[in-house]
């Protein structure tokens, strides 16, 4: 936005070429944010499903996946309560990286935050990523990030089957 009268006030997030970001493990106090953003964004991307039923049934799926996985938060480095993005996933020993869901706030999209969160899981370029959920951006990222959509991972024992080596790519 340009103004003939004055320049916009300096905004360190917008005006820096690098976000002041810290990656930390999610804490119990982050759970409500993760649940609400996961459910809302997933429901928004699946408008053909009844919203009430999706919320009720998917809450159990999210709880199971979060209990068996790791959730990491991308936060402002000097204020760990200012959350930019989060990712729930699991690095399977001698197996693929499982990513259940990644959420980036609108204002911070296309700034490399999802890549930063993938680095927490020691993702290597070209390595396959198993996705238990698929959203709008899946198709555009599928080839570049070697994504494989496997919704069966959402089953109660789905994560365990990858962890135990019963399911492989």
What is each model feature region?
Residues 2-19, 123-169:
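Terminal substrate-recognition subdomain of acyl/acetyltransferases
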Residues 16-17, 78-82, 95:
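Short, solvent-exposed loop/turn segments that connect beta-strands within catalytic domains
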Residues 20-36:
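A short beta-loop-alpha structural element at the N-terminal edge
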Residues 48-78:
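Active-site rim helix/loop that mediates acceptor-substrate recognition in acyltransferases
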Residues 73, 81-91, 98, 103:
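Conserved beta-strand in the GNAT
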Residues 100-101, 107-110, 130, 141:
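Acidic/histidine-enriched, beta-strand-rich ligand/metal-binding domains
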Residues 104-124:
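Conserved acetyl-CoA-binding loop-helix of GNAT-fold acetyltransferases
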């Amino acid at each position: 936005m340009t103004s003939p009268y004055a320049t916009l006030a300096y905004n360190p997030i917008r005006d820096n070429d690098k976000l002041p970001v810290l990656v930390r493990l999610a804490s119990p106090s982050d759970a409500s944010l993760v649940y609400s953003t996961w459910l809302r964004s997933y429901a928004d991307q699946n408008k053909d499903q009844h919203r009430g039923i999706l919320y009720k049934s998917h809450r159990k799926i999210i709880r199971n996946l979060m209990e068996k996985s790791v959730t990491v938060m991308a936060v402002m480095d000097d204020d760990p309560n200012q959350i930019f993005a989060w990712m729930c996933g699991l690095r399977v020993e001698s197996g693929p990286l499982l990513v259940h869901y990644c959420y980036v706030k609108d204002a911070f999209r296309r700034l490399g935050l999802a890549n930063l969160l993938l680095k927490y899981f020691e993702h290597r370029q070209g390595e396959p990523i198993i996705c238990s959920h698929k959203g709008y951006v899946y198709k555009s990222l599928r080839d570049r990030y070697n994504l494989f959509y496997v919704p069966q991972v959402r089953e109660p024992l789905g994560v365990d089957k990858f962890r135990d080596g019963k399911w492989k790519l």
